Amino acid sequence: MKDMVFDELKQNMEKGLQALEKSFNKVRTGRASISLLDGIKADYYGTPTPLNQVATLSVPESRQILISPWDTSALNAIEKAIQKSDLGLVPNNDGKVIRISIPPLTEARRKELVKVVRKMAEECKVKLRNARRDANEEFKSMKKNNDISEDQMHDYQDQVQKMTDSYIEKSEDILVQKEKEIMEI
């Protein structure tokens, strides 16, 4: 029974960290990254289709993304989809491929992005703490039903706290790494 609670706790905490990393990937830094285009879908023959399913995406230079559609008739749809996105990217269509130059971030924008990623990290910590609370509630319920003793409950809660501290530390490490990436010129 306790193993199920710990497995669920670990699973929830892993999901929280993965969600944090995924949301960090969508934050634009000064570098070109294909993950910037993850949420963008082009209207391909009337169907909203992810860019990676209609074109080859690559990063030939540190500040440029190259989109080579398999079907050149999709060029305009891809270009429109990028312009509609709120990423502030300007696509350059040369008739065969689309190039997106990533402009360097201003100091003010960098500081703004750091605030955004800190908020995301704080939301992740809240998710981790909620998972901790749920696990502790499970153990209290088990104690109430006399499935475990008071001492066992406290031991399990200590283990839950250690696991929570470990995952919060991991989220801090991810945050520090992202802040460094954003502030890098």
From Swiss-Prot:
CDD domains, per database record: RRF
Tree of life domain: Bacteria
Record SUPFAM superfamilies: Ribosome recycling factor, RRF (SSF55194)
Subcellular location: Cytoplasm
GO MF term list: ribosomal large subunit binding
InterPro entries named among the record's database cross-references: Ribosome_recyc_fac (IPR002661), Ribosome_recyc_fac_dom (IPR023584), RRF_sf (IPR036191)
GO CC annotation, single: cytoplasm
Keyword terms of this UniProt record: Cytoplasm, Protein biosynthesis
Gene Ontology terms: biological process: translational termination
Annotated TM spans: none
Pfam families membership: RRF
PANTHER family: MITOCHONDRIAL RIBOSOME RECYCLING FACTOR PSEUDO 1, RIBOSOME RECYCLING FACTOR
Protein function: Responsible for the release of ribosomes from messenger RNA at the termination of protein biosynthesis. May increase the efficiency of translation by recycling ribosomes from one round of translation to another.
Family: Belongs to the RRF family.
The name this protein goes by in its record: Ribosome-recycling factor
Organism name: Syntrophus aciditrophicus (strain SB)
